[in-house]
Structure formats: C-alpha cells, structure tokens
C-alpha cells in the first residue's frame, strides 16, 4: 500500500471510523496506521492473511460507500481549500490570523 493510499484511508477512517466494526477498526489501525503487513496482523489476531485482507477490503469499501453517499470528507476538503484561497487573497492581518486559527482547528 503506497503512502498516498494510506493518507487517504487515514482521512476516511477519521471521518467514518465509528461506522466500522471493532475488528475492522483494529485491522485499519494495524494495516494503515501502524503499517503492519497482513501476515503480521494475522499473527497478532490469530487469523489468516486472507482474513485480514478481506476485512480490510470490506472496511475500505464501507468507508468509500459512505463518502460517496455523504461526501463529508469532500465537503471538508472543499472548505479547507476555500479558506486557504481566502488566506492568499486577503491582506488584512486580523482576518489572516482568524483564518489560520480556523485552519488549525480543521
């Protein structure tokens, strides 16, 4: 799994992680956040590598489906992009400080 995919899955997990089963959360944590191999995760959980892959694939599919329907991450990234553009357009220091505070909170 490449870095870009892990970053995207981490973002999806942050938004939709609570919709996953405990097992799916655990496998996302091990595979994506801790960068363990399917074999390592399987050994830790006493399941096969194939079971790890299957559970991860189902978790990813579930999160992608939710994002496709709800578009929460897409909207969040849109707001962040608009604030960043607004920051570039303004010369008002007070406004820039407020925008930076908002961006930090996001």
How would you name each of these model-derived features?
Residues 4-16:
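Short, Lys/Arg-enriched N-terminal segment that forms or immediately precedes the first helix
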Residues 22-34:
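Short amphipathic alpha helix immediately N-terminal
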Residues 28, 41-42, 52:
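Hydrophobic positions on the alpha-helical face of helix-turn-helix-like DNA-binding modules
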Residues 55-58:
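Residues within the DNA-recognition helix of helix-turn-helix
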Residues 60-67:
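C-terminal flanking helix
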Residues 80-106:
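Helix-turn-helix/homeodomain-like alpha-helical modules used for DNA recognition
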């Amino acid at each position: 799994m490449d870095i870009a995919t892990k970053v995207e899955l981490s973002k999806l997990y942050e938004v939709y992680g609570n919709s996953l089963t405990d097992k799916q959360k655990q496998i996302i944590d091990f595979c994506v956040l801790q960068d363990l191999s399917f074999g390592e995760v399987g050994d830790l959980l006493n399941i096969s590598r194939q079971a790890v892959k299957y559970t991860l694939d189902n978790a990813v599919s579930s999160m992608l489906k939710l994002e496709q329907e709800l578009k929460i991450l897409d909207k969040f990234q849109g707001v962040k992009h608009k604030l960043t553009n607004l920051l570039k357009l303004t010369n008002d220091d007070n406004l820039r400080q407020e925008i930076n505070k908002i961006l930090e909170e996001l």
